[in-house]
């Protein structure tokens, strides 16, 4: 048998604890952490990256993780000029994205892909 992954070890140790509200990690077949992790008997969820680090706030509103994971990846890159995605509380991409570094903005679709052109008058940009 192959050695247990960090996710599987984390899952086993959590299952043994007697905490009232606990998050028992869900692991993918490839041993990475599932992106959306939810607490037992509760509506609270959180996004994890594949190594098991939180990528979003713990919230009853978090439903998807694509934006939060991209946001964490960019923040962790340490690049000052990195474009940090803006996410809605539920984890969806905010329709209007802003790049502070050069004060530009644009609209995105539900996958975070740019729609239309880049603008510099961000107050007047309306994204539907």
Curated annotation (Swiss-Prot):
Q: Sorted alphabetically, which SUPFAM superfamilies does this protein's record hold? A: Thyroglobulin type-1 domain
Gene Ontology CC terms, in alphabetical order: basement membrane; extracellular space
Q: Name one GO molecular function term.
A: cysteine-type endopeptidase inhibitor activity
Tissue distribution is:
Expressed by the venom gland.
Give the keywords, sorted. Answer: Disulfide bond, Protease inhibitor, Repeat, Secreted, Thiol protease inhibitor
Xref: InterPro entries: Dev_reg/Prot_inhib, Thyroglobulin_1, Thyroglobulin_1_sf
- The Thyroglobulin type-1 domain is annotated at 4-67, 72-127
Chief subcellular location equals: secreted
Q: What's an example GO BP annotation here? A: cell-matrix adhesion
Which residue windows are coiled coil?
A: none
Role according to the record: Cysteine proteinase inhibitor.
Protein known as: U24-ctenitoxin-Pn1a
- Give the species this sequence originates from: Phoneutria nigriventer (Brazilian armed spider)
Phylogenetic classification of the source organism: Eukaryota, Metazoa, Ecdysozoa, Arthropoda, Chelicerata
């Amino acid at each position: 048998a192959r050695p247990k992954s960090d996710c599987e070890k984390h899952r086993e140790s959590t299952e043994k604890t007697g905490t009232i509200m606990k998050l028992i990690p869900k692991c993918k077949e490839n041993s990475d952490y599932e992106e959306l992790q939810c607490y037992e008997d509760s509506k609270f969820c959180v996004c994890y990256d594949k190594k098991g680090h939180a990528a979003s706030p713990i919230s009853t509103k978090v439903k998807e993780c694509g934006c939060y994971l991209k946001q964490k990846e960019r923040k962790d890159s340490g690049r000052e000029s990195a474009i940090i995605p803006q996410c809605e509380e539920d984890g969806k991409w905010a329709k209007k994205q802003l790049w502070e570094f050069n004060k530009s903005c644009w609209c995105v679709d539900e996958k975070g892909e740019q729609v239309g052109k880049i603008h510099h008058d961000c107050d007047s940009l309306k994204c539907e």
